[in-house]
Amino acid sequence: MPTGRSSLLAGRNKAPLTPDEIRRAVNTFLGLDKNVSARYDDSSRTAFHEFVEPAGTYGEVVFGPDIYPGSSVIDPNSALSLDAAAAHELTHYHRWKDKTALASDDLEHLDEALTSLQAIFRYDRHLSETDVRLLVADAVQRLQLFVHQKQTVVAVEEGAENLGRSE
């Protein structure tokens, strides 16, 4: 996934976080993986970022209010708990570091599905059974979105071909 793009879908929390909620989120990231930088930015959507500086390149999770689930459950992603969402974002870091992230825009949903599945394996001992199921459901939904996206592209291409033939 291209860095800086939010991997959390619509339906997540939008309300500003209290100092206690920010502290809880920071502690969740630290408890899952103390080696990955994570910081709060109240104006950001939660995403993994790659930063290039003169001293070198580094990765960091920047989280916003959407690190918490929303009040209405639109899809599995909107219901991901703080633990599951943090595990997912931290896994983006590891996929970037290990050079296994899919950087192409047209593979975004596939990359998100793989990230949710790998988060289960990487952080399974920290996740509840519900978190694991929600991450699996998120991966399934992302695969469905990927297939739908590909089918739409094919339909548009076929429509253009047919239009060219009828002229």
Per-range role (PLM):
Residues A10-A15, V73-P76, S104-D106:
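Second-shell loop/turn segments in exported
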